[in-house]
Amino acid sequence: MAPVRGDGMRGLAVFISDIRNCKSKEAEVKRINKELANIRSKFKGDKTLDGYQKKKYVCKLLFIFLLGHDIDFGHMEAVNLLSSNKYSEKQIGYLFISVLVNTNSDLIRLIIQSIKNDLQSRNPVHVNLALQCIANIGSRDMAESFSNEIPKLLVSGDTMDVVKQSAALCLLRLFRSSPDIIPGGEWTSRIIHLLNDQHMGVVTAATSLIDALVKCNPDEYKGCVNLAVSRLSRIVTASYTDLQDYTYYFVPAPWLSVKLLRLLQNYNPVTEEAGVRARLNETLETILNKAQEPPKSKKVQHSNAKNAVLFEAINLIIHSDSEPNLLVRACNQLGQFLSNRETNLRYLALESMCHLATSEFSHEEVKKHQEVVILSMKMEKDVSVRQMAVDLLYAMCDRGNAEEIVQEMLNYLETADYSIREEMVLKVAILAEKYATDYTWYVDVILNLIRIAGDYVSEEVWYRVIQIVINREEVQGYAAKTVFEALQAPACHENMVKVGGYILGEFGNLIAGDSRSAPLVQFKLLHSKYHLCSPMTRALLLSTYIKFINLFPEIRTNIQDVFRQHSNLRSADAELQQRASEYLQLSIVASTDVLATVLEEMPSFPERESSILAVLKKKKPGRVPENEIRESKSPAPTSGPGSVLQNNVHVNNSHSKLNNSNANTDLLGLSTPPANNVGSNSNSTLIDVLGDIYGSNNNSSAVYNTKKFLFKNNGVLFENEMLQIGVKSEFRQNLGRLGLFYGNKTQVPLSNFNPVLQWSAEETLKLNVQMKAVEPTLEAGAQIQQLLTAECIEDYADAPTIEISFRYNGTQQKFSIKLPLSVNKFFEPTEMNAESFFARWKNLSGEQQRSQKVFKAAQPLDLPGARNKLMGFGMQLLDSVDPNPDNMVCAGIIHTQSQQVGCLMRLEPNKQAQMFRLTVRASKETVTREICDLLADQF
């Protein structure tokens, strides 16, 4: 009788030992080749191998493959092991197949049939081996071959729990590679109800599967919310016994609790049912209460499990952002963790508070921990925690604490880790600009940034300070004085030289009256830095010098000497040679008037999104709050360093800078360039000038139509035979600025010209409009401008009117026009995906939160035209959100001084009836009516 062999496989152990004892690569290859020859002879021999021998040789082949050698035989023997009833042999067969067999193998059909046989087995061990093999391979072929069998195993009442668990995980693996394999219909409900299973392994695996399914198809699996809330409540609440015996260091089912909390975060709002919402809130409160209880164990495993559930609950509270009480409690709990001795807890607390700082309900609570966060930034040993503290200070900053936070960040920047300095510089620059009430403070901050961390100040930052100084007349003298003083330091960073050269070249004349900063002193100070700078900075300084010739003719000779030195072979850089040579000739040949025209002061830069903010969003896309995307729109002055140098010498532009009327205007940072007076007597010339401004061809037949300005900001607002009125406007959050351009089309002056704002005191409490006075005489063929600023305090229904009166040929003229200041001008577009949009849409289903109108199309249905109008209305037109491609949906936030009002809109065309249905939903009743009234009959 043959001896009974165990599973030790002594031959395999000896072979592995021989390989380990090899002294060289050649010896190892020789031993492997010898073994391969032996295995090949055994497989091809006349003697039939038993299961043990096949298993042993297949294991050797597998080991050789794992050493990095190709295996081109033994596959059939491994497949034969699948039909064995012995676990160890079947296990090795599946292991070999999972590792070595690819889906293009000739044996794949035979393998699939063997797997199907095991799936139908009554032995749960064999079924599990088959499921594990399917999951390990996880190919499209496997998904298609077993898309029917695995779901049946998962929901069948006869399937053992351990098999259900494996089936759920196997299905999850296949779903990730082939999302279309999961059957719908009645299967959906049966899969969801696995959340009620009493087996810990089954419900945990099922939760992972359902979480993946919900991310792909949230509407179909929305029924899981009620079950997840119910199960979570039973686990957390002590009065229930659900899974209370599955405790990990006194924490009931912590992994399942975390998975259920993450599952619920796929929906916003989590649920619309009041009862379910109340139960969820009660559960979250219970979790927060348990966090306050004394620990039941001193072991770290207890605190880790307890805190894992707590932090996931806080994430759900932040995700919902609808329960002020829970948000405040979560903030207070996180505040306690800021002083915890565990580094990971402090990091997680700071990270969660970054999200809480963006909520209107908890922002003020987060600010209460400002001092502790500042200490974390300065004192933490771990750089990642210090980095997170900086992120939190950035997130909690507002107009009330901006100066303090910016100063603390500047102080820390001197000793900060090199890895976080560049990002800190960007954040300080953004905060200083965003919350500047006095732009002299902003200039001080940026110059300090350059002084402290000049190497980390990117081009976008120093471009930015130049733009702001050029666009704001009231800060130009201070900037010139401050940068002049900064340049006197013995060691001066090159970025400081760039800023100083640019600003002194433009505004050095503003400080030239002081003998300490006389023209020659300015020139010598800048030129003392010249030889220490890169060619790019030297080129900028040469441009500054030619500007000095225009500003200070008395030092022309000194500057021309410098140009002569660098226009010959003494300068190795071709760009510097050419620039110096051209500037020298310009200073010699050009008359004073020509020189003044060519080298006149730079005009205001156009307004775009802040390039600094764009850089920060690229570096930290997840940590820049969405509401900052439109915060700072003063642009980088150029697209690159070269263009700064080129633009420093500027040919005369027909536009001049618009003077700011008040502090609000300054903060807006808008630069609407007015057209200069036109002295021509030709009507057509005047109209052409306006056409240049507005980018459109206007003519004398234009009619007054304020409704078209619902969808545009610039254009001709009014025109008759005497007067043409153009408008150019810009808006940011709840602030706006309009430039009105009055053009006299007649051959005689218009006297007693007087525009008067018609806007009641009651309406001013909702929309505050300030208007700058204009000259009383509008000369023939001339154009003047008038600046208006607007601040939206709360939503309003009407728009202000301006009454214009003047005398023409002795006859009094008077008429009124509506200003394009409807409430939609204060929209901020909001990006949403389909899930978020319809979740929010359903949440705003109350009678007072919606308004609807059905109206006949004013002209044959023009869907592209309707889309273009909506794109200009101020809201974000959301593509691929509505299931009906003809429907148009939009989202936006109306910014007022008192609050922000979220608004959703849906426009549904009916091509057959030539009609539209317009639905507007918002969190404020008056807004729904106002937006609906504005848009009705516009299509």
Curated annotation (Swiss-Prot):
It comes from Drosophila pseudoobscura pseudoobscura. Adaptins are components of the adapter complexes which link clathrin to receptors in coated vesicles. Clathrin-associated protein complexes are believed to interact with the cytoplasmic tails of membrane proteins, leading to their selection and concentration. Alpha adaptin is a subunit of the plasma membrane adapter. Residues 623-660 are annotated as: Disordered. One of its GO terms (molecular function) is clathrin adaptor activity. One of its GO terms (biological process) is synaptic vesicle endocytosis. Belongs to the adapter complexes large subunit family. This is AP-2 complex subunit alpha. GO terms for cellular component: AP-2 adaptor complex; clathrin-coated pit; plasma membrane; presynapse. Residues 635-660 have a biased composition (Polar residues). It comes from the Eukaryota. It is a peripheral membrane protein. Adaptor protein complex 2 (AP-2) is a heterotetramer composed of two large adaptins (alpha-type and beta-type subunits), a medium adaptin (mu-type subunit AP50) and a small adaptin (sigma-type subunit AP17). SMART domains: Alpha_adaptinC2. Residues 623-633 have a biased composition (Basic and acidic residues). Its main location: membrane. The lineage of its organism: Eukaryota, Metazoa, Ecdysozoa, Arthropoda, Hexapoda. Keywords: Cell membrane, Coated pit, Endocytosis, Membrane, Protein transport, Transport. It is found in: Cell membrane; Membrane, Coated pit. InterPro entries: Adaptor_Complx_Large_Subunit, AP2_complex_asu, ARM-like, ARM-type_fold, Clathrin/coatomer_adapt-like_N, Clathrin_a-adaptin_app_sub_C, Clathrin_a/b/g-adaptin_app_Ig, Clathrin_app_Ig-like_sf.
